[in-house]
Amino acid sequence: MEDDKDIYTKDGTLDIHKKPANKNKTGTWKACRFILGTECCERLAYYGMSTNLINYLEKQMNMENVSASKSVSNWSGTCYATPLIGAFIADAYLGRYWTIASFVVIYIAGMTLLTISASVPGLTPTCSGETCHATAGQTAITFIALYLIALGTGGIKPCVSSFGADQFDDTDEKEKESKSSFFNWFYFVINVGAMIASSVLVWIQMNVGWGWGLGVPTVAMAIAVVFFFAGSNFYRLQKPGGSPLTRMLQVIVASCRKSKVKIPEDESLLYENQDAESSIIGSRKLEHTKILTFFDKAAVETESDNKGAAKSSSWKLCTVTQVEELKALIRLLPIWATGIVFASVYSQMGTVFVLQGNTLDQHMGPNFKIPSASLSLFDTLSVLFWAPVYDKLIVPFARKYTGHERGFTQLQRIGIGLVISIFSMVSAGILEVARLNYVQTHNLYNEETIPMTIFWQVPQYFLVGCAEVFTFIGQLEFFYDQAPDAMRSLCSALSLTAIAFGNYLSTFLVTLVTKVTRSGGRPGWIAKNLNNGHLDYFFWLLAGLSFLNFLVYLWIAKWYTYKKTTGHAL
């Protein structure tokens, strides 16, 4: 009988037929190969459409560079904000598998509409030479398609990484160790898709046409759907645990109702379900922590709670695990906030890096011209280089000195990436200083491009990619690991909203800088003609903000308390 029990997972996961998940038939890498294939194709579709979006808006939709930059940042921000919707639905009602399955329909609808708007006569802008004129209706269709995609990705992005991690049982030490590698390879395949998008698809868009250039990503998304459903029999599914927002609100209400109640010194007197498992479906019990103690009042039993045989209302009395869920989320918020500036730095690859690249010599040999947006390929190559190097070389090397099983703690890993991101902005700033000096020396103010090769941008892209491997992958693992079991989609979405706010911060900074520096008839830092501007000042601003952000992060990380679990999930 003991052997029979050992073949099933102990984290409460089920198979697609709603039976306890068999370790030998479900989960681990045999399930993750389908999830990784899905993510690779979905990211190819996303980046195949988004990488060159600023050029599409500027050249096809005839938008001015500042307007195009803000539109891309706002849309990108929305793509990383909508995951809150998908995460709530996944954790509360559908579970991760069925949430992904539902939202891919919206995603494909948006991709299809965008492809049609770029290829069907009457819906495409009228062009005369290199100048295009989009009508209000054509612009509206384009943005409806884009925001359908943003909604669709909201149900996929917060669920797919958590769904992959669900395939490894935390109670099994061997599987738990493999989960850390999963996040590295998950980010690796994201960048395989991004590499194809930023090279092949951008070239198609600039040299063949936008119809084909957006049609191929749509087909890639369809292939992602096939990959996802093909693995259904191998997946382990976590049961949705009910609305986490309701549970957190119950703790707040109950603790406020008992604001005058004294918390017992003996924490064992706080209310908790007496069973081995948590009363929250899909969640293990959480140990009590001695921080944010005001919320412990929600778990203090009073005479009114014990009156009558009926179970006390959850709006009056909450379990310790329920209280600790709220505490865990609050503890994550300061770490989350420090990711906003990093995300703002990352977002420059799709906006001002491209605008800077447009002013440089894009020729590679006499006959081939590389699109400026394709330089993001070097960010991707950097990630593809550093992800396996980190997993296979850096972790074993660091483990010898730190004694930590992962080489670095998750917070140390994130911090290293924050430092590297500062140098990426310094690199971009140095290049812009050199570019402007060349313009001034040779009086090239009215030239669209100058004879400086675009490959001088490679270091700044490469540094951003290196920073991603440390910070973004570290955040993926950190927010999954530190999230309460029944709130993992929500906390994964929370990490993504930092990217959303980073994009919105970028929009705010561009708007503020443009308004202030263009006053009095001046060209401004981000001028219509960058040769007359000072884009280098914008990069110094971001480098300074990143440095201050890192100092704040160090203080926050020093005081962070990691969560502790007990028991098994229902």
From Swiss-Prot:
Biological process terms in GO annotation: dipeptide transport; pollen tube growth; protein transport
Tissue-wise expression: Expressed in developing and germinating pollen grains and ovules.
Top-level division of the source organism's lineage: Eukaryota
Alphabetical keyword list: Cell membrane, Membrane, Peptide transport, Phosphoprotein, Protein transport, Transmembrane, Transmembrane helix, Transport
Residues passing through the membrane, by range: 100-120, 136-156, 182-202, 210-230, 335-355, 370-390, 414-434, 454-474, 493-513, 537-557
Cellular location(s): Cell membrane
Disulfide-bond pairs as recorded: none
GO MF, one annotated term: dipeptide transmembrane transporter activity
Recorded topology in the membrane: Multi-pass membrane protein
Modified residues (Phosphothreonine): T99
Annotated CDD domains: MFS_NPF8 (cd17418)
Pfam family, one: PTR2
Disruption of the gene: reported phenotype: No visible phenotype.
InterPro entries noted in UniProt: MFS_trans_sf, POT_fam, PTR2_symporter_CS
GO cellular component, one term: plasma membrane
Function recorded in the entry: Peptide transporter. Mediates the transport of di- and tripeptides. High affinity transporter. Involved in the uptake of peptides during pollen germination and tube growth.
Family, similarity comment: Belongs to the major facilitator superfamily. Proton-dependent oligopeptide transporter (POT/PTR) (TC 2.A.17) family.
Name the record gives this protein: Protein NRT1/ PTR FAMILY 8.2
Name of the gene encoding the protein in the UniProt record: NPF8.2
